[in-house]
């Protein structure tokens, strides 16, 4: 799978997007200067016809690899309260923290 990496720097930190080259999937990570060592996974999306083919898992592995290479030890995310979405993150090793405002806060130490 060919991936495109897009980096942005902001006053508060930076973002990294990993995009599948055909545009069918994307994951976005945010790194805030105020929280060194922590990544916030701010979005993961795979278009419906491409789901259940392992693409999301590959993007998550790319995200985790990037984090390890850059001194990040924890990834946080907020998951919608949909069983299959939460099941996916749990299979990837993410641990639920608490439900808040219609989302499940989750994390993984890497």
Regions found by a protein language model. Give the residues of each.
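Acetyl-CoA-dependent GNAT
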Residues: 1-38, 42, 99
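Conserved acetyl-CoA binding element of GNAT-fold acetyltransferases
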Residues: 37-48, 104
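Conserved acetyl-CoA-binding loop-helix of GNAT-fold acetyltransferases
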Residues: 46, 52-65, 91
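Conserved GNAT acetyl-CoA-binding A-motif
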Residues: 60, 67-80
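Conserved beta-strand-loop-alpha-helix junction that forms the acyl-donor binding cleft
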Residues: 76-86, 102-103
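Conserved acetyl-CoA-binding loop of GNAT-fold acetyltransferases
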Residues: 90-99
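A general lysine-centric signal
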Residues: 108-109
């Amino acid at each position: 799978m060919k991936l495109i990496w897009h980096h942005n720097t902001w006053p508060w930190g930076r973002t990294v997007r990993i995009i599948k080259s055909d545009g069918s999937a994307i994951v976005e990570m945010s790194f805030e200067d105020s929280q060194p060592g922590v990544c916030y996974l701010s979005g993961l999306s795979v278009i419906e016809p491409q789901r259940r083919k392992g693409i999301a898992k590959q993007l998550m592995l790319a995200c985790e690899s990037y984090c390890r290479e850059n001194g990040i030890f924890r990834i946080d995310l907020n998951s919608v309260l949909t069983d299959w979405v939460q099941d996916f993150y749990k299979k990837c090793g993410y641990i639920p923290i608490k439900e808040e405002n219609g989302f499940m806060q989750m994390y993984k130490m890497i």
